């Protein structure tokens, strides 16, 4: 599987940070291809203008239709006319791990990173297939959300992570938060590693990890538990967690 992503952005240099770590490894392995189109390169006036004042008044500027439309046209000429366009915006649907798993199979994708007060709505109506948000807060532009999405999708590519089970055991992959992690030394001050992790009993370790995952999810994200239909074993482990924590 190869992930092909195009990005429409005024600041392609921001994405240089992706050349490190997991994403950098995927790029070197040719498991991931990133391409960029800057709307400013498609502005037709001498000042290469990409924004203008909003109709109806108000603060800030709005990204213009024409440069974005031409940038998207160039991107689709390279990636394919039917390539889906994803607009990163606080008004979008909340991005979840389930969506990431689904959309990795929709490659190639074009990510549209807006700036200023937003994008002319006519561009969104004409060109955008879906709108996604990474949370209920405001950033200066769509570049960071685009990088979040690229990172989340790249992690799911087979062979990109150091261990084959790393992605499958991440938080949210099974609809739960991650279990607790420990490494050497065995004891720090008065805080030892839980003895079960030193036992070598893989079944007991798996049981403990699931119990901690269920308990942590209940403590921090009860909405995830309520959306999940717990098995008898999971309910029993969650009850044990409550008893041990009381």
Swiss-Prot record:
Biological process, per Gene Ontology: tRNA N1-guanine methylation
Catalytic activity: guanosine(37) in tRNA + S-adenosyl-L-methionine = N(1)-methylguanosine(37) in tRNA + S-adenosyl-L-homocysteine + H(+)
Annotated Gene Ontology cellular component terms: cytosol
EC numbers, comma separated: 2.1.1.228
Key words, A-Z: Cytoplasm, Methyltransferase, S-adenosyl-L-methionine, Transferase, tRNA processing
Superkingdom per UniProt: Bacteria
Compartments, as annotated in UniProt: Cytoplasm
GO molecular function, one term: tRNA (guanine(37)-N1)-methyltransferase activity
Pfam families per the UniProt record, alphabetical: tRNA_m1G_MT
Protein residues bound to S-adenosyl-L-methionine: 114, 134-139
Top-level class of the enzyme under EC nomenclature: transferase
UniProt keyword tRNA processing, yes or no: yes
Function: Specifically methylates guanosine-37 in various tRNAs.
Subunit text: Homodimer.
Protein family membership: Belongs to the RNA methyltransferase TrmD family.
PANTHER family (UniProt xref): TRNA (GUANINE-N(1)-)-METHYLTRANSFERASE (PTHR46417:SF1)
The protein's name in its UniProt record: tRNA (guanine-N(1)-)-methyltransferase
Organism: Coxiella burnetii (strain RSA 331 / Henzerling II)
Gene transcribed to yield this protein: trmD
């Amino acid at each position: 599987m190869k992930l092909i992503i195009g990005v429409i952005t005024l600041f392609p240099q921001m994405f240089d940070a992706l050349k490190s770590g997991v994403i950098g490894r995927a790029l070197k392995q040719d498991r991931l291809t990133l391409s960029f189109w800057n709307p400013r390169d498609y502005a037709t006036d001498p000042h290469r203008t990409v924004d203008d004042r909003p109709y109806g008044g108000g603060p800030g500027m709005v990204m213009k239709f024409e440069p974005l439309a031409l940038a998207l046209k160039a991107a689709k000429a390279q990636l394919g006319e039917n390539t889906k366009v994803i607009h990163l915006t606080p008004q979008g649907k909340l991005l979840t791990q389930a969506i990431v798993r689904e959309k990795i199979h929709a490659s190639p994708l074009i990510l549209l990173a807006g700036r200023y007060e937003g994008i002319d709505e006519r561009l969104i109506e004409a060109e955008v297939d879906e709108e996604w948000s990474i949370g209920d807060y405001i950033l200066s532009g769509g570049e960071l959300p685009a990088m979040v999405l690229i990172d989340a999708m790249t992690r799911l590519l087979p062979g990109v992570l150091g261990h084959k089970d790393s992605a499958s055991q991440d938080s949210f992959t099974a609809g739960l938060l991650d279990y607790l992690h420990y490494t050497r030394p065995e004891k720090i001050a008065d805080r030892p590693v839980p003895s079960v992790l030193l036992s070598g009993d893989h079944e007991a370790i798996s049981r403990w990890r699931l119990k901690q995952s269920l308990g942590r999810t209940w403590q921090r994200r009860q909405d995830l538990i309520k959306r999940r239909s717990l098995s008898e074993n999971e309910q029993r482990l969650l009850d044990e967690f409550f008893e041990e924590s009381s």
